[in-house]
A protein has these predicted regions:
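ATPase catalytic-site recognition across NTP-hydrolyzing enzymes
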Residues: 113-173
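Conserved nucleotide-state-sensing and coupling region of NTP-binding domains
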Residues: 1-26
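Extended acidic/charged loop-beta regions that coordinate divalent cations
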Residues: 28-34, 108-121
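Short, flexible loop/turn elements at secondary-structure junctions
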Residues: 14, 22-24, 83-86, 110, ...
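Short basic/glycine-enriched coil/helix segment immediately N-terminal to the Walker B
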Residues: 12, 27-38, 166
Length: 173
């Protein structure tokens, strides 16, 4: 029996096995015959509710790094994580913060003002969605730029430096 793709497990004619697991389900012990996973894809792991909880993001990041990444076989495997960056506190953000992770970001509208996927979206459609959704929501859902409501300054604008000795300042507020 080659399984059923609708149930999340199947094997192709050339003996390539596919297994699906939901967020938080244990992948430990996953194998097909004597083979362990060598290719893992995670899609849209984050959601708004999770991003509001530092503890949940921390726990899910731990699950990805331990349970998921730990189920690779002895050889190097490929790990792909796709999704929109919907929160600064998110599993996707935590993963991309690692210097060992290669990141590719595709914005719905490129710097040149053209859609990244013109076969699906026209610039008129995207601008219409932006008008309907509002700037902040559009930035979050399409441009990987989660803007915290009420935030005046973007974090990337702030430059941190070691403070000089107090005698070098004329006044401080």
């Amino acid at each position: 029996n080659s399984g059923c793709w609708q149930e999340g497990e199947f094997v192709t004619k050339d003996q390539c096995a596919f297994f699906s697991r939901g967020r938080g389900q244990s992948p430990r012990g996953l194998r097909f015959r004597d083979k362990r996973p060598d290719y893992i894809v995670v899609d849209d792991l984050d959601d708004d509710e999770m991003c509001r909880s530092e503890a949940r993001v921390r726990e899910m990041t731990k699950w990805v790094k331990e349970a998921l990444f730990g189920c690779f076989g002895g050889k190097e495997g490929r790990f792909i994580m796709v999704g929109n960056l919907i929160g600064k506190n998110s599993v996707l953000q935590k993963m991309t913060d690692s210097d060992t992770v290669y990141t590719s970001t595709v914005y719905a509208i490129g710097k040149d003002g053209t859609p990244a996927w013109p076969e699906c979206y026209t610039i008129e459609l995207l601008r219409s969605r932006e008008r309907f959704m509002g700037y902040r929501s559009f930035q979050k859902e399409y441009m990987h730029n989660p803007i915290t409501e009420g935030a005046v300054f973007q974090e990337r604008w702030i430059r941190w430096k070691r403070m000089l000795k107090l005698r070098y300042y004329e006044s401080l507020v």
